[in-house]
């Protein structure tokens, strides 16, 4: 029985959505800049290629030109895990704000991060694929998502994220 559970869990750790670089993205970087307040070098999502009411999938092409590789680590560059979690959170923001008519007037703020596991190093040349699933309906502006980041078919990071959606104060 234990072996069966392990096999089922392993099968569930492959990406559910397949990115095809030959197809235009659902949202390109310009759309993403409209939806999120983040800007380079802290905008960590390049494309969204799937989105529905409960799921979003996107990618980040990790290049040697990323500013964090200057110090993390110069001889063996590795993407900081906290930035992988942030990238998953940014994808979550796109899921949560995706159907809001004026997403630029809202922000999402972390409330809680649970069960973060880093399973593989992310290095220059990797393409991170994010898959975010809304675990329950958004209530009182609070969203809870299951977030996963893959490199190829290998799970690199997973976490459960909770965030609050807040209308920006400078907007009426």
What are the residue ranges of the model-derived segments?
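Flexible, low-complexity linker/boundary loops enriched in proline and small hydrophobic residues
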Residues: 2-49, 56, 162-163
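Hydrophobic beta-strand-centered segment that forms part of the acyl-chain substrate-binding groove
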Residues: 2-7, 17-26, 92-131, 156, ...
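Catalytic strand-loop segment that frames the active site of acyl-thioester-processing enzymes
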Residues: 39-79
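Intrinsic-disorder/low-complexity, polar/charged segments enriched in Ser/Thr/Lys/Arg/Asp/Glu/Gln
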Residues: 43, 53-57, 127-129, 144, ...
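Hydrophobic beta-sheet segments that form the core/acyl-binding groove
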Residues: 48, 113-152
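Active-site helix/loop of acyl-thioester processing domains in fatty-acid/polyketide metabolism
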Residues: 48, 79-103
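Short acidic, Gly/Pro-enriched loop/turn segments at secondary-structure junctions
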Residues: 55-60, 125, 169-170
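Mixed-charge, glycine-accented linear interaction segment located at domain edges/termini
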Residues: 144-172
């Amino acid at each position: 029985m234990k072996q069966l559970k392990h096999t089922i869990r392993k099968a569930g750790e492959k990406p559910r959505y397949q990115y095809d670089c030959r197809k235009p993205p659902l949202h390109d970087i310009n759309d993403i800049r409209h939806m999120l307040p983040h800007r380079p070098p802290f905008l960590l999502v390049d494309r969204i290629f799937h989105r529905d009411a409960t799921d979003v999938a996107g990618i980040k092409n990790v290049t040697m030109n990323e500013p964090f590789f200057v110090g993390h680590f110069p001889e063996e560059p590795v993407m900081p895990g906290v930035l992988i979690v942030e990238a998953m959170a940014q994808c979550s923001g796109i899921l949560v704000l995706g159907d809001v008519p004026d997403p630029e007037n809202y922000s999402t703020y972390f409330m809680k991060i649970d069960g973060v596991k880093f399973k593989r190093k992310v290095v220059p040349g990797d393409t991170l694929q994010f898959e975010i699933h809304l675990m329950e309906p958004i209530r009182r502006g609070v969203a809870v998502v299951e977030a996963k980041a893959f490199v190829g078919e290998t799970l690199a990071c997973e976490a459960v994220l909770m965030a609050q959606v807040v209308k920006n104060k400078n907007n009426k």
